[in-house]
Design a protein with these regions (language model features):
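A conserved acidic beta->alpha catalytic loop
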Residues: 59-62, 254-262, 302
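Acidic donor-binding loop at a coil-to-helix junction in glycosyltransferase catalytic cores
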Residues: 376-382
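Glycine-rich, basic loop-to-helix element that forms the pyrophosphate-binding segment
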Residues: 85-91, 274-290
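Acidic donor-binding/catalytic loop of UDP-sugar-dependent glycosyltransferases
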Residues: 108-121, 260, 300-314, 384
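Short aromatic/hydrophobic "clamp" motif used to bind/position activated sugar donors
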Residues: 103, 295
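Short, well-formed alpha-helical segments that are part of the catalytic scaffolds
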Residues: 12-45, 229-243
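A recurrent flexible, glycine/aromatic-enriched loop bordering the glycosyltransferase active site
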Residues: 131-137, 323-330, 342-360
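Conserved donor NDP-sugar-binding/catalytic core segment of glycosyltransferases
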Residues: 124-130, 307-333
Length: 445
């Protein structure tokens, strides 16, 4: 008989995945662990029927949680022993003593673990006395053997970055043969979480897992709103953001407003920072202030679609940067043309602008140096920098409606302004002094 032992604890708040605190709350840590347990259960379902499964668990918590996930086919037993090494040895020794010919034991925090990995451990055991499957951080996630060897587990510092090498050295010292399996990454730290975000962009199979779904839904979003003389729009925007406060960080960064903007921001509900004027300065300050995975830069005169956070998370499942499409609260045919050009430009020219609501990974934003120190064109240059780095842009499903306050007047005036904006960007690309371009732009606020 072949036996597969799953080593886990019952998901209990503030007991499981505690190394992820405070990046995740205790409740989120339980959610992540539970997602990984469901993935493990699906892996077990795919195993050859000749492999018997045992769930060895720490006794804290309600066992029915595990039984609801793994079902009645598995056999459930409490872990015994003082150290982690003792617990693993006792479990393997017990199962071997009951007639198993070979045993593999794995933890549950390996999102990439597949039935192929488990079955390959038994194939390796047919040719070796022991097997180890290493983790990227220097540990191992699976150990297997045909006879119980206590000395293999008598090492200090489980959880350190030398566990795999120390264990291999003990196996060699005992004169046992060793098969080494596929290396995978486990989830213990914030850095591990970010590594699996990267995997989500490239691995469609991983995106289908319970773990990937949890990671996607629990990415932290920071909304940064630069303000300057926005007394006519800031109250309306706060009403839109009211129901989002519990699910993300929201920061207003004022650039020295001379009207009532600052006093109209409800600081009992929203964080307010003060910066020197300039959207680049304001947005950079806001970005640095939030503990977020995703940054969403939002202009104050925007009207959001119904479920903006869900749209952002859907977008950032596949892209590292992107935006919403733009629309205008105007019936002017020219504004419809402007809308089409702006949205098409994201895919055609790989350029997005601030009024579309720029969305970007915080790590990527910091890596490229944040918004450049420019009085104007900071969003344009950000897009050019991303384009140079080969970053693909995505677009959310629905549109942000934004004010057409810059496009006042009749069709001729609107056309002249659109042409002027095009020429200003051309001047910037040619290297015309940015102060000259800024003077031509004229802030309407």
């Amino acid at each position: 008989m072949k036996a597969f032992i799953v080593f886990t604890r019952i998901p209990v708040e503030n007991k499981t995945k505690t190394r992820l605190l405070p990046y995740y709350t205790g409740k989120q840590c339980v959610g992540l662990h539970t997602a990984m347990l469901y993935d493990m259960a699906e892996t077990i379902e795919k195993l050859d029927t000749s492999i018997k499964t045992y769930i060895y668990y720490l006794p804290e918590g309600d066992l029915s949680i595990l039984k609801n996930i793994f079902g009645e086919k598995a056999e459930y037993r409490k872990q015994t022993g003082e150290s982690l090494g003792d617990k693993m040895y006792n479990a393997i020794s017990e199962v071997l003593s009951e007639g198993a010919e070979m045993v593999s034991l794995s933890g549950t925090d390996i999102p990439e673990l597949s039935s192929t990995d488990v079955e390959s451990s038994f194939k390796l055991l047919m040719q070796n006395d022991t097997v180890l499957f290493p983790t990227e951080d220097g540990g191992y996630y699976l150990v297997g053997m045909k006879k119980a060897h206590k000395d293999i587990f008598n090492i200090e510092g489980y959880g350190g970055n030398t566990v795999f090498e120390k264990t291999r050295a003990r196996i060699e010292k005992l004169g046992l043969s060793l098969g080494i399996g596929t290396i995978h990454r486990d989830i213990d730290t914030k850095e591990d979480i970010k590594a699996f975000y990267e995997l989500m962009y490239t691995d469609e199979n991983f995106r289908k897992t319970h773990t990937a779904k949890f990671l996607k839904e629990n990415k932290k979003i920071g909304i940064i709103i630069p303000t300057y003389n926005e007394e006519e729009t800031v109250v309306s925007l706060q009403k839109q953001l009211e129901n989002l406060r519990e699910r993300c960080e929201i920061v207003f960064v004022d650039g020295g407003s001379t009207d009532k903007t600052v006093e109209l921001i409800d600081t009992s509900k929203f964080r307010l920072l003060h910066s020197k004027k300039g959207r680049n300065n304001q947005m950079n300050m806001g970005a640095e202030s939030v503990e977020a995975d995703i940054l969403f830069f939002l202009h104050c005169d925007s009207i959001l679609p119904p479920n903006p956070l869900e749209e952002i998370l859907d977008l950032m499942e596949k892209y590292r940067a992107g935006c919403f499409g733009i629309a205008f609260k105007s019936l002017s045919p020219l504004m419809f043309i402007c809308r089409y050009i702006s949205n098409h430009r994201v895919f055609d020219r790989k350029v997005m602008f601030g009024d579309q609501g720029i969305i970007i990974e915080k790590d990527l934003f910091m890596e490229i140096g944040m918004y450049p120190d420019l009085p104007i064109m900071e969003d344009y240059q950000l897009s050019l920098t991303l384009k140079e780095k080969g970053i693909k842009l995505g677009m959310a499903k629905h549109r942000i409606y934004t004010s057409a306050r810059r496009f006042k007047g009749g069709p001729v005036r609107k056309l002249k302004l659109m042409w002027k904006m095009n020429r200003l960007r051309a001047k910037y690309r040619r290297g015309v002094d940015i102060e000259e371009i800024s003077a031509m732009y004229k802030d309407v606020r």
